[in-house]
UniProtKB/Swiss-Prot annotation:
NCBIfam families: FeS_CyaY (TIGR03421). One of its GO terms (cellular component) is cytosol. Belongs to the frataxin family. GO terms for biological process: iron-sulfur cluster assembly. One of its GO terms (molecular function) is ferric iron binding. PROSITE patterns: FRATAXIN_1, FRATAXIN_2. The gene is cyaY. The lineage of its organism: Bacteria, Pseudomonadati, Pseudomonadota, Gammaproteobacteria, Enterobacterales. Keywords: Iron, Metal-binding. Involved in iron-sulfur (Fe-S) cluster assembly. May act as a regulator of Fe-S biogenesis. This is Iron-sulfur cluster assembly protein CyaY. PANTHER family: FRATAXIN (PTHR16821), FRATAXIN, MITOCHONDRIAL (PTHR16821:SF2). It comes from Buchnera aphidicola subsp. Schizaphis graminum (strain Sg).
Amino acid sequence: MKKNTNFTQINNNFYRLVDDLFLKIEDNLNFYDDKIDIDYEVQDYVMTITFLNKSIIVVNKQESLRQIWLATKFNAYHFNYKIDKWICNRSNKDFWEIFEKSCSIQSNENLIFTAFKRIKK
């Protein structure tokens, strides 16, 4: 049986994109580590973020759909990777815009994440 190398390449690329996103999320959360109480745990591509008020946000991958899902206290979002960004399939907003606003609301803090402002090298 011939191996489908195109599928493998797409799958590997998806995991690289997800890994990159999760690392950027961690970098941004760690920036606030000594300023506010934010805990996060990553297990099997599911990141659970818990704020001091016990409010939770979950970020996870949906491999079969090639999507990132974001679950907040108020809504759920599905993101597809388009033109170097994770874009919400309903609102067409960037992941970082929604994630930053959701974290700010749920933590009762004005959080500003820099990952979406970084220039790609």
